[in-house]
Amino acid sequence: MKEMYNSRKPKEELIKLKNKENTMEFIIAEEGLPINIGYQGASIAYYGSEIELSYETVPPHGDEIFSASLPLLGIKLPFWMYGRNLIFLDDYYLLAETVKTGSWNPITSMLINIHTGEYASLGDWYNSILVKDEGIELVNTFDRKSMVLKDINDLDWI
């Protein structure tokens, strides 16, 4: 069954395809539009690549946590990520809120190249993201830490 799907973000428009044997969502992401996924997990396609999120746990404060893999590359990422505020940038990158495998805290924002499997920590948790002409403005609305990401080549990629 194919239907238009609006998630918790009002401007987000995704295509949701349901398979009767598997409740995992298939989502075609759009650049800059946050995606929030539920406990069923999701396979997200973006510019010729794909990331698959599989449910792992839900912490006491809510918001599901997922393990992630890049099935076209045969790579399982070595951290878990929250299924909220997943933002795809440029043609290659996913910005996600991540945690160490088996935990839910501390949260760190991570930039992931879904075409190569490389990733770079942004060093802190940024829950407010704004794309501007001069770069990506990232803010932690709880402790007011902020940064502007201008050049991804300045990050330490793993």
Regions found by a protein language model. Give the residues of each.
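Amphipathic, interaction-prone secondary-structure segments
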Residues: 43-68, 91-92
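Generic preference for hydrophobic/aromatic residues in regular secondary structure cores
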Residues: 7, 50-53, 68-71, 128-130, ...
